[in-house]
Amino acid sequence: MKLLIVFGLLASVYCFHRECSIQECCENQPYQIEDPCPIHYYSDWFIKIGSRKSARLVQLCEGDYGRRIPIHYEMFGNYTISCEPLEINCQAPPVGSLIVRCSYDYDFVEHHDVRVVLDFI
């Protein structure tokens, strides 16, 4: 029984580590986010609205890689400054959470999502 509990805790820590990135930034200052995707992977940034796995994802950048530009939404204000690399105003997302989608393929057919949590200093 104890072994099962220990295994469950280890699995939880491992899963949390792989699906979440915690980064520190100065509040209301421009901040270049460290991309948690592995090297040679494509990354696409979103705001996830809602807590469910099937929650709506709102894309932060558009265009082809090498020429991506921010999409400005009225509800987010000027949250996104630039896209390559992603630079934001260091603040909690106005709604939802910040998500990066990582994929080895350009078309993102197979991907995994990583939640980025900002710790304000």
UniProtKB/Swiss-Prot annotation:
Keywords assigned = Disulfide bond, Signal
Tell me the PROSITE patterns matching this sequence. SARS_ORF8_IG
Q: Which Pfam families match?
A: bCoV_NS8
Q: Please, which domain of life does this record's source organism belong to?
A: Viruses
Q: Which residues does UniProt assign to the signal peptide?
A: 1-15
Q: Which residues form the SARS ORF8 Ig-like domain?
A: 19-121
Coiled-coil regions listed? none
InterPro entries named among the record's database cross-references? ORF8_bat_SARS-CoV_HKU3-1-like, ORF8_betacoronavirus, SARS_ORF8_IG
All disulfide bonds of the chain are C25-C90, C37-C102, C61-C83
What further note is attached to this protein's record?
This protein corresponds nearly to the fused 8a and 8b proteins of SARS-CoV.
* Protein name (database record): Non-structural protein 8
